[in-house]
A protein has these predicted regions:
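Short loop segments at secondary-structure junctions
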Residues: 28-29, 157
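Short beta-strand segments in beta-sandwich/barrel cores
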Residues: 21-23, 106-107
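C-terminal catalytic subdomain
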Residues: 61-157
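"…together with the soluble PPM/PP2C metallo-phosphatase catalytic core" -> "…together
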Residues: 1-17, 23-28, 35-97, 151-152
């Protein structure tokens, strides 16, 4: 339904964040998470802990996710969805020397890909449904290698 983007502009020496993404810029962590998502993720975790299957729990929260997107996206929170981007919901960060850009597919972002992948592997091994140590709206589905797609790039400028 929506897309996110995190962009580095070499000309402006800035990072632009639209949607749920994360970065480490000059050794400082930044994120742009969806304002409604944590509450819905907590509901999913509670449903699973109370005995509902992960698939059923995901289906149970899907109407809330869709409603939150249609009510809030590009009105309170910036996303890419084919309508004009809600510019007050974007984030611009100046860069002086180093940049790590990543999607929200990494529960914990680290300065290196190796460390970010290791943290993801630990999360998947210890809490594959993302209901305890990293609360999320979805967990690992059989046949997938992770709970979400992911992208990572590290630059020195």
């Amino acid at each position: 339904l929506t897309a996110s983007a995190i962009i580095y502009s070499h000309q402006r020496q800035e990072v632009w964040m639209v949607g749920d993404c994360q970065a480490i810029i000059d050794n400082k962590y930044y994120d742009k998470s969806k304002p409604f998502e944590q509450e819905i993720a907590l509901q999913r975790a509670k449903l699973i802990k109370n005995g509902m299957s992960p698939t059923e729990a995901r289906h149970a929260i899907e109407p809330q996710l869709v409603n939150a997107m249609t009510e809030g996206q590009n009105r309170q929170y910036a996303v890419i969805d084919g309508t004009p981007i809600y510019m007050p919901g974007t984030r611009t960060i100046p860069v002086s020397h180093s940049v790590v850009l990543a999607s929200d597919g990494y529960p914990t972002l680290h300065p290196t890909l190796r460390d970010s992948e290791a943290a993801l592997a630990q999360q998947l091994a210890n809490d594959p449904q993302n209901i305890a140590t990293f609360i999320a709206t979805k967990g690992l589905v059989e046949g997938n290698s992770s709970f979400d797609d992911r992208a990572y790039i590290s630059l020195t400028v």
